[in-house]
Amino acid sequence: MQKLIVVILAAGQGTRMKSSMPKVLHTVGDRSMLEHSYDRAKDLGADAIHIVYGHGGEQVKSALSHLDANWVLQQQQNGTGHAVEAAMPSIEDDALVLVLYGDVPLVRVDTLKSLVSAAVESGFGLLTAKLDDPTGYGRIIRDGDGVVKRIVEQKDGSAEELKTDEVNTGMLVVDSSKLRDWINALDSDNAQGEFYLTDIIAMAANDGVVINTVQPTSIDETLGANNRVQLAELERYLQQRKANQLMIDGVTLRDPARIDIRGQLTTGMDVVIDINCLFEGDVKLGSNINIGANCIIRDSILADGVTVMPNSIIEESQVGNGAMVGPFARLRPETVLKEDAKIGNFVEVKKSTIGAGSKVSHLSYIGDTSMGKNVNIGAGTITCNYDGTNKHQTIIGDDVFVGSDSQLIAPVTLESGATIGAGTTLSNTAPQDSLTISRSRQKSVPGWSRPKKRS
């Protein structure tokens, strides 16, 4: 069986992006466009991946140094044929070569599998598409029997040829030995003065090679981005694709056009997601979860039965069965909510464990805290965990009641069953099953009158 070698062309300057960053590093979803193309090559099980870079190449290599690929420098950008030629010394004979593009990120792996199969059958597979408006694309020219004969570029085509609505996507699979011969025979006698990879189509046809064509499931698979408008269009296509898959998997989206997934979102059954929610990184949702509008959830796990009220943020946290978050709550990294815990409006929790059934309902900050079960934290309570140099722990046992407007000066312990009176500033241990209170005794002054303004 022939090896599969993937060449990703990523040397374009991308001047229309008007950016100091190379075009292929601009992101769609959570990943650069080049990484999307690389991912598809890995999904195919490619035996080797060569990335041809040019403009801003060192910046590209530095940003994506984690990729398992051979980086090939194209010294001068003299067209797609010249770019593939730069990679040929690294490609062995008797292999299949798949050409992808670093700025065409949405091609599906199933489409590429079909393209590879087409090449296995005849030695040449070509991905084409039919467009309502093919302006700007190279046209597929067939003979009277429907056999592909050549590709003509927009600037080189006759008026009759440009009427053709079938276009070249640039993606192809070809035998490496034949590709080497055809690449060596390319010339730059065209309107652009460049070496077109598409010219090998006519060479293959003249050599009697049957060019099998494959068409994608949807046109967004073939689209690239040369400017920010097109980049935004790709983002919408990707998000719509992800939203559709969620709904197929049983998720209710109140508006599929108003959800963004920048990473991996996995869900159980009967999940409901309201509008304008953003999921980043690796997010796992259990079953019977309700997420309100305008929430951001990143790298977190939500167990079954969780409710997230509108305008809440959850970052690198774990939320247990039946817990409730929000509205307007924030869970910062390393927060764990046990089952049936509640974090209410305008509460921030950081690097803390909130025990089963415990409640922090209003206007509080809980940081670096270990909290037991069935604890009630009153409104306006603050764990004072930072002394200006170090963070300190607050330990709260089970069945503790903390009155409103209390300050817990860490390091400090509240033993199980302790009650803290409202307005307390606690700096020492609160004993078990006791009331602890530290505030000035109330005093009333009979007959007192307010000062009067001087005339």
What kind of feature is each model-predicted range?
Residues 17-21, 386-387:
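Conserved catalytic-core motifs of eukaryotic protein kinase domains, centered on the activation segment
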Residues 58, 67, 107-191, 209:
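Conserved core of the sugar-phosphate nucleotidyltransferase
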Residues 167-268:
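Conserved alpha/beta core of the MobA/IspD/sugar-nucleotide pyrophosphorylase nucleotidyltransferase superfamily
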Residues 10, 53, 101, 128-129:
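Short beta-strand/turn micro-motifs composed of small residues
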Residues 1-19:
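N-terminal nucleotide-binding beta1-loop-alpha1 segment
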Residues 20-36:
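Short catalytic helix/loop segments, enriched in acidic residues and glycine
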Residues 252-437, 442-443:
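Structural signal for interior beta-strand "rungs" in well-ordered beta-sheet cores
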Residues 1-5, 31-117:
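Conserved N-terminal catalytic core of the sugar/cofactor nucleotidyltransferase
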